[in-house]
From Swiss-Prot:
It comes from Rhodococcus jostii (strain RHA1). Gene3D superfamilies: P-loop containing nucleotide triphosphate hydrolases. This is Aliphatic sulfonates import ATP-binding protein SsuB 1. The complex is composed of two ATP-binding proteins (SsuB), two transmembrane proteins (SsuC) and a solute-binding protein (SsuA). GO terms for molecular function: ATP binding; ATP hydrolysis activity. GO terms for cellular component: plasma membrane. Residues 9-227 form the ABC transporter domain. It is a peripheral membrane protein. Belongs to the ABC transporter superfamily. Aliphatic sulfonates importer (TC 3.A.1.17.2) family. ATP binds at G41, P42, S43, G44, V45, G46, K47, S48. It is found in: Cell membrane.
Length: 245
């Protein structure tokens, strides 16, 4: 996707209620075209709900989501979840092409990009958890989304596979820039991947940390370590506040 066609987002007054429970409180947020933004926060504050609202899978109780930049053809987003959601009765290539037509060559290119060249005829049951998530990433990218929405996509993976997937995502985005929103419980993951890290609590967005470091980032960097401690402290305070309600 050419840099000039990148899409940004404006969230204005987004609020959401489930019956008598409010999970999002008047969220105002501007995401610049091509920006990578991560959301941290305690469970139950609406992080995944916010992604679903941006994707159009849920409607906010109030507020609007608007796109900025790009072309006039509308904004298309794709979500990638913690569960790979592959169809077990379809092979790898068919899973990548799901919902599209005449995309075989592009699907094969993406499987190469994610390190699964030659595995297109395999069944999901023949793949490891990390490999299945690679297929899910290729499937999301095949649709060439303006906005890639990642809901804890690596949360179920072991530590080594998680780092490998983070590095893969970095490489793919370096070659195919796009706007990305990530929900994660892994503070280090957010700091390594993101341009901005937002702390979402029951009070709304209480921290907006901008990371000026170039990528790839060294995980032992002293400044990243200091930010990690700061964010962990904020998460602990937010979790304690929720527990006391």
């Amino acid at each position: 996707m050419p840099a000039t066609n990148l899409v940004g987002l404006d969230l204005v007054g987004i609020g959401h209620r489930y019956r008598d429970t409010t999970v999002l409180h008047d969220i105002d947020l501007t995401v610049e075209p091509g920006e990578f933004v991560s959301f941290l926060g305690p469970s139950g504050v609406g992080k995944s709900t916010l992604l679903r609202i941006i994707a159009g899978l849920e409607q906010p109780t109030h507020g609007v989501v608007e796109s900025t930049g790009g072309t006039s053809g509308g904004t298309m987003s794709r979500m990638m979840f913690q569960e790979d959601r592959l169809l077990p009765w379809r092979n790898v290539l068919d899973n990548v092409q799901l919902g599209t037509r005449h995309q075989r060559e592009r699907a094969l290119e993406l499987l190469y990009d994610v390190g699964l060249a030659g595995r297109e005829k395999d069944w999901p049951s023949e793949l490891s958890g990390g490999q299945r998530q690679r297929v899910a990433l290729a499937r999301a990218l095949l649709h060439q989304p303006d906005v890639l929405l990642l809901d804890e996509p690596f949360g179920a993976l072991d530590a080594i596979t998680r780092v490998a997937m983070q590095q893969l995502l970095e490489r793919v985005l370096a070659e195919q820039p796009r706007t990305v929103l990530l929900v994660t419980h892994d503070v280090e993951e957010a700091l390594v991947l993101s341009d901005r890290v937002l702390l979402l609590t029951d009070q709304g967005i209480t921290r907006d940390l901008r990371i000026p470091h170039a990528r790839p980032r060294h995980r032992g960097d002293a400044q990243l370590a200091a930010w990690k401690e700061e964010l962990l402290d904020g998460l602990l305070q937010a979790d304690n506040a929720l527990s006391s309600l």
